[in-house]
Amino acid sequence: MFTLNLLLYIIPILLAVAFLTLIERKVLGYMQFRKGPNIVGPYGLLQPFADAVKLFTKEPLRPLTSSILMFILAPILALSIALTIWTPLPMPNTLLDLNLGLLFILSLSGLSVYSILWSGWASNSKYALIGALRAVAQTISYEVSLAIILLSVMLINGSFTLKTLSTTQENWWLITTTWPLAMMWYISTLAETNRAPFDLTEGESELVSGFNVEYAAGPFAMFFLAEYANIIAMNAITTILFLGSSLTTNLNHIDTISFMLKTLLLTMAFLWVRASYPRFRYDQLMHLLWKNFLPLTLALCLWYISLPIALSCIPPQM
């Protein structure tokens, strides 16, 4: 029974990731006035499965001078963390109902740094190492703003439990009152998932392919799956935090469809950003966080702390 539950949890995520890669190629294709994948299956719908078969049947090569254990463990850790992040998310029901669900998600996203660092260091390649160091600095930096934004949202929510956010947003979504936080959160999730215009870790013109340059076949596919699973997970968290994950109805299937549609629209925005914007310079990336986002998020956090205290003398209105 446990194995069946595990499969029912993992397979839909992997299927969503598979079709997200297809949607991305189709969207980018049409934005660049071309068709995208259209050969394998009707309208190219079987392309993700063809890619999966190709990647997982190839021989996984590794550099002769690489550190074998870390080289093998890095992609496994990346995919494991990407799949574990989904456990406390209410969609509208959770797999693991945690009191500190948001802290759990924040700590897991911090752990994903290790898989990138291990892969870059264990490859024994200067390009992979530079890509890994960039990724670590970028991820750790943007986690600061993510943590402060989460703290601000939790001050409004009054709890670290994700399920209570749907109750908080019964009358109106938090994005209406906290839109500056939502905007900074969304840009920070782009940086956290190493997506364009913050894809400095995979700068093809500079670093060949970034931290995974020495990976091929199955291990490379695992990194790929982890990246796209993280993208969908981050957009799901954005939906829960700012867009009210469930409606006021007691119909779970309608709540789930609403949640899925919001997450899909946010994910499509990720692809639109990739097609529209060029890559940032590294110094611009760091300036955006430390000189713009950090002061703003701290100021807003102090505002949300002081507002309830300042208004505590006013009697509640009926």
UniProtKB/Swiss-Prot annotation:
Catalysed conversion reaction = a ubiquinone + NADH + 5 H(+)(in) = a ubiquinol + NAD(+) + 4 H(+)(out)
Topology with respect to the bilayer: Multi-pass membrane protein
Its BP terms in the Gene Ontology are: aerobic respiration
Upper classification of the source organism reads: Eukaryota, Metazoa, Chordata, Craniata, Vertebrata
Q: Name one GO molecular function term.
A: NADH dehydrogenase (ubiquinone) activity
- Record the organism: Sminthopsis macroura
Q: Where in the cell is it found?
A: Mitochondrion inner membrane
UniProt family annotation: Belongs to the complex I subunit 1 family.
Report TM segments: 3-23, 68-88, 100-120, 136-156, 172-192, 223-243, 253-273, 294-314
Q: What is its main location?
A: mitochondrion
What keywords are assigned to this protein?
A: Electron transport, Membrane, Mitochondrion, Mitochondrion inner membrane, NAD, Respiratory chain, Translocase, Transmembrane, Transmembrane helix, Transport, Ubiquinone
> PROSITE patterns in the record, alphabetically?
COMPLEX1_ND1_1, COMPLEX1_ND1_2
The protein depicted here goes by the name NADH-ubiquinone oxidoreductase chain 1
